[in-house]
C-alpha cells in the first residue's frame, strides 16, 4: 500500500456498530444497533423492514460496544466523553451513564466475568476495571505503548492481547499480575485481533497492508507464522457460530474475505462498498451485518448470493455493530 493510502486509512480508523432489541422494532425481533461515531448516537434498525426507527444519544465518539456477562446491558464506549452508556439490549432504553472511564475506545469483558478491560487509544494505556455485576472499579492502568487499538481475552481469562496501532506491535498482558508478558512486532497498522478456540493462535488485521497476520501464542514466546492475503485495509473480524470460518473486513478493498480457520486460506469474498468496518453475523452464517464507514450505511450481505441485499442509511462514521440474534461468539 502506498503512503497516501496508509495516511488515508490512519485518518479513518475511528469507527463503531451494534445490534440489539429496541424502540420501534416488532416484539420479539432483536434490532440492529449502529454506533455513529461522529454523531454521538446509536441508530436503531428494524431487521424486518431494514429501516432506522430511532436514534439514541450517547457521549462523544462512540466506537465500540460489548454485552455485559449477564446479557442485561449493552455497554457503549464513548471515547471523547470519558463515559460508558449502558443500554437495555431488548428495549433500547438507556439504563445509565458511567463517568470517569478515561478514553474508552475498545472494550472486552473477561470470560470469568470479573474484569472489564478498556483500551485507551489516545492515551497509550489499557485499563483493568473490577466488575461485580453492577459497579466498575479501576484496579490497574497498564502503559502499553503507542495507540492500543483492539483487545482480545483468552478463554481462560488469563491473558489480554492488545494491538498497538501506531507502533506495529502485539502486546500480551497477564491478567493475574496485570503486567506485560511480552510484545512482538506485527505488520503495518494492526487493528482487530481474534483468538482461536484453543487459545493457540491469534489473527491480526493489518489495516496498513493487505493481509491478516497469524501468530502462534501456544508457547512462552510468540511467533509470527503466516500472512494471509485478503485485501487492502484488512481490519475487523467476526467468526461463524461453529468457529470454522473467520470473516475479515478489508476497508480499502471494499470487500469481506472468508478464511477457513483450519487451513488458514481464503475460501470466499463478498463485495462491501463504502469502507467496511465492524461486523456481526446471523446464527446460520448466511447474513453479515457490516458498517460502511465512509458511506454512512449499514450493509446486509447475503453470503449465499454473494451480494449486498440491503443498505440502510445511518449516521456519520458508523463503526460498531451488535445483535442479540447472532452467531455464537
Identify the function of each model-found stretch.
Residues 2-13:
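Bacterial N-terminal signal peptides that target proteins for export
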Residues 18, 22-329:
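Predominantly soluble domains enriched in secretory-pathway, periplasmic, or organellar proteins
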Amino acid at each position: 500500500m502506498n503512503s497516501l493510502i496508509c495516511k488515508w486509512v490512519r485518518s479513518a480508523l475511528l469507527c463503531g456498530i451494534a445490534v440489539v432489541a429496541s424502540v420501534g422494532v416488532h416484539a420479539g425481533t432483536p434490532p440492529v444497533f449502529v454506533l455513529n461515531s461522529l454523531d454521538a448516537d446509536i441508530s436503531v434498525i428494524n431487521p424486518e423492514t431494514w429501516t432506522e426507527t430511532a436514534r439514541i444519544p450517547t457521549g462523544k465518539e462512540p466506537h465500540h460496544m460489548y454485552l455485559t456477562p449477564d446479557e442485561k446491558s449493552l455497554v457503549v464506549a464513548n471515547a471523547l466523553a470519558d463515559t460508558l452508556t449502558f443500554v437495555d439490549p431488548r428495549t433500547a432504553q438507556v439504563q445509565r451513564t458511567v463517568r470517569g472511564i478515561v478514553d474508552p475506545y475498545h472494550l472486552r469483558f473477561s470470560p470469568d466475568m470479573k474484569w472489564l478491560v478498556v483500551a485507551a487509544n489516545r492515551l497509550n494505556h489499557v485499563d483493568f476495571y473490577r466488575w461485580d455485576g453492577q459497579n466498575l472499579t479501576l484496579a490497574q492502568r497498564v502503559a502499553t505503548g503507542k495507540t492500543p487499538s483492539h483487545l482480545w481475552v483468552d478463554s481462560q481469562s488469563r491473558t489480554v492481547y492488545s494491538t498497538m496501532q501506531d507502533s506495529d506491535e502485539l502486546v500480551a498482558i497477564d491478567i493475574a499480575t496485570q503486567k506485560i508478558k511480552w510484545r512482538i512486532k506485527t505488520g503495518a497498522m494492526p487493528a482487530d485481533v481474534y483468538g482461536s478456540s484453543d487459545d493457540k493462535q491469534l489473527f491480526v488485521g493489518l489495516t496498513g497492508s493487505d493481509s491478516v497476520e497469524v501468530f502462534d501464542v501456544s508457547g512462552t514466546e510468540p511467533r509470527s507464522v503466516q500472512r494471509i492475503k485478503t485485501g487492502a485495509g484488512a481490519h475487523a473480524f467476526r467468526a461463524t457460530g461453529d468457529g470454522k470460518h473467520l470473516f475479515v473486513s478489508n476497508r480499502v478493498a471494499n470487500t469481506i474475505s472468508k478464511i477457513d480457520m483450519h487451513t488458514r486460506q481464503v475460501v470466499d469474498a463478498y463485495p462491501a462498498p463504502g469502507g467496511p468496518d465492524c461486523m456481526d453475523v446471523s446464527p446460520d452464517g448466511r447474513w453479515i451485518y457490516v458498517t460502511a464507514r465512509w458511506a454512512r450505511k449499514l450493509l446486509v450481505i447475503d453470503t449465499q448470493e454473494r451480494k449486498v441485499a440491503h443498505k440502510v442509511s445511518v449516521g456519520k462514521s458508523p463503526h460498531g455493530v451488535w445483535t442479540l440474534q447472532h452467531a455464537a461468539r
